[in-house]
């Protein structure tokens, strides 16, 4: 149980060989330097999402979020000047879609094969993301992405080109979000200064999770500032209301394969350690 909660790897194996990954049963893809860019696990349910382009459309989910953090943040936004704008409905629909995505996909481990003698669980582990909203980004887009991160229970660092209202900024900081205001030029300088910084040395910084969710219209400058380093993933697609898409940057996929028998006799010890559906 301790090992499963601490180990940092994309594929974990307990009491079995580490070779023989199979589509759906054991989606494959590593963490850290075992992966490049913003891809997802091969053979997993999100594989095609990372290979596709997505355009915003109105979400239809009506689920209610169970996250107190999200509810309190949304209430503060609604009571601020942003709540009086037409695009607040965009934020609310996004929150409902996040809740639906959490209830149906991200909030628990999946074992679709259900072999019985072997458990193959795909689960989602929250990871820190640096959300960058450049000077062209709207407040609604920024908050929609941040709320997706909060719904995923992920640590979020937020860098904005334009400051948000004081009360909204206050609730974000109260929820543990690392908040800063940087011009586009200042942000590029920050990235350039860390273009060659080893990943371990990024611990404790906004780039600790080696993931950037970029909201803006100049993603090329972000890649250039990073010097093309492959171990920092940049998500730059248009902001959507779909929780199934917007929550992905804040979650790392982890496949856990556990032998559930001993000499042919079923052994259910792992069910006390890791649950699945």
Residue ranges of predicted features:
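C-terminal segments
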Residues: 1-128, 132-144, 151-277
